[in-house]
């Protein structure tokens, strides 16, 4: 716990500094990875797009998806949905970084006093709780980003899109499905966010003081690689939940919907096989570079601005 003399940093409370630093680094890294992000979403949700008549045939992998998307829509189309993603990701990641330390303080476990296992469990719990809390505020933006990214402009459809932008997604969804349409898939999202964010933050905070020591301490490359490994593992562990929630999102505005997340799991596995739950996972691993960048850039900003005196965020 910080004492009273350490409550102000650059004239701002640590909570505010944490919020701003986390959000800025997240927005920059997500914009850089936007093309990978969209390809991942297209491959992941292609079966729902085919059922809705918005895609004429399946993609034969990440390379084929990239080739067809740029041919049909142009290079800049790889950033479609990025505006919504930045708007969504700024508060999401910023709130994650900010609230995680609040939750961590609530658990109050110390590695030297309570042991490594309990300290690590506290990190996992605080990371998961922070992610689930922030999800309540930004879920509809995640929904809108998903619909925009999967709004393919296929040659067969004459180039017509379903949505004309972020506001149009909200307008059409509210008209067809009401508020429920904006929150379809929220259940598996909560489960997925706890698994992913819990590992994303918890494992990074727990492993970092063990691995990034000696010559590796404050090393950008080592911090980046550790962050990439953590995001990759967390992403694979939670990927089936991510697939189900996004497939449920894609049914808003459609005549046929999944009855529940369990029904979605059952139907996808029965009709497409278990491997369909992992479609786009390869692109998701590449996308992990963005998440790793968030953590490592955040740590470097702490070193430059606070000389590691401030221990918010991933510190």
From Swiss-Prot:
Cellular localization per UniProt: Mitochondrion inner membrane
Segments on the Mitochondrial intermembrane side according to the record's topology features: 1-13, 105-115, 214-216, 305-315
Phenotype upon changing residue 192 to A: Abolished ADP:ATP antiporter activity
Impact reported for residue 238 to A: Decreased ADP:ATP antiporter activity. Does not affect bongkrekic acid-binding
Amino-acid positions noted as binding ADP in the UniProt annotation, renumbered to this chain: 88, 245
Segments annotated as Solcar repeats: 13-106, 118-210, 218-304
Reactions mediated catalytically: ADP(in) + ATP(out) = ADP(out) + ATP(in)
Motif Nucleotide carrier signature motif, residue numbers: 245-250
Residues on Mitochondrial matrix side: 38-80, 146-184, 243-283
Main location: mitochondrion
Sequence positions that bind a cardiolipin: 62, 81-83, 166, 184-185, 260-261, 280-282
Gene Ontology annotations for the cellular component aspect, listed alphabetically: mitochondrial inner membrane
GO biological process, one term: mitochondrial ADP transmembrane transport
Source organism, top-level taxon: Eukaryota
Topology with respect to the bilayer: Multi-pass membrane protein
Molecular function terms, GO-annotated: ATP:ADP antiporter activity
Family: Belongs to the mitochondrial carrier (TC 2.A.29) family.
Swiss-Prot/TrEMBL domain comment: The transmembrane helices are not perpendicular to the plane of the membrane, but cross the membrane at an angle. Odd-numbered transmembrane helices exhibit a sharp kink, due to the presence of a conserved proline residue.
Subunit structure: Monomer.
Name listed for the protein in its UniProt record: ADP/ATP translocase
Species: Thermothelomyces thermophilus (strain ATCC 42464 / BCRC 31852 / DSM 1799)
């Amino acid at each position: 716990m910080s004492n009273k003399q350490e409550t102000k940093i650059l004239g701002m409370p640590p909570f505010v500094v944490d919020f701003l630093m986390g959000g800025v680094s997240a927005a920059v890294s997500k914009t850089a990875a936007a093309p990978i992000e969209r390809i991942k979403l297209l491959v992941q949700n292609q079966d729902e797009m085919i059922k809705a008549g918005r895609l004429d045939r399946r993609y034969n992998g990440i390379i084929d998806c990239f080739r067809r998307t740029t041919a049909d829509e142009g290079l800049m189309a790889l950033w479609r949905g990025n505006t919504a993603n930045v708007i969504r990701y700024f508060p999401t990641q910023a709130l994650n970084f900010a609230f995680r330390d609040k939750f961590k303080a609530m658990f109050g476990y110390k590695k030297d006093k309570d042991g490594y296992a309990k300290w690590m469990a506290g990190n996992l719990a605080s990371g998961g709780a922070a992610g689930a809390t922030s999800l309540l505020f930004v879920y509809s933006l995640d929904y809108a980003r998903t619909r925009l990214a999967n709004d393919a402009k296929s040659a067969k459809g004459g180039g017509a899109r379903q949505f004309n932008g972020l506001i149009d997604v909200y307008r059409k969804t509210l008209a067809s499905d009401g508020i429920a349409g904006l929150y379809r898939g929220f259940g598996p999202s909560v489960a997925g966010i706890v698994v992913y964010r819990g590992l994303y933050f918890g494992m990074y905070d727990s492993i970092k003081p063990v691995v990034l020591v000696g010559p590796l301490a404050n090393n950008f490359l080592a911090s980046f690689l550790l962050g990439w490994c953590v995001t990759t593992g967390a992403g694979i562990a939670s990927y089936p939940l991510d697939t189900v929630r996004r497939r449920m999102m894609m049914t808003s505005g459609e005549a046929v919907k999944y009855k529940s997340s369990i029904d979605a799991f059952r139907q996808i596995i029965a009709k497409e096989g278990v491997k369909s739950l992992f479609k786009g996972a390869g692109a998701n691993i590449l996308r992990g570079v963005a998440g790793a960048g968030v953590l490592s850039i955040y740590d470097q900003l702490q070193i430059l601005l606070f000389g590691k005196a401030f221990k918010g965020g991933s510190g």
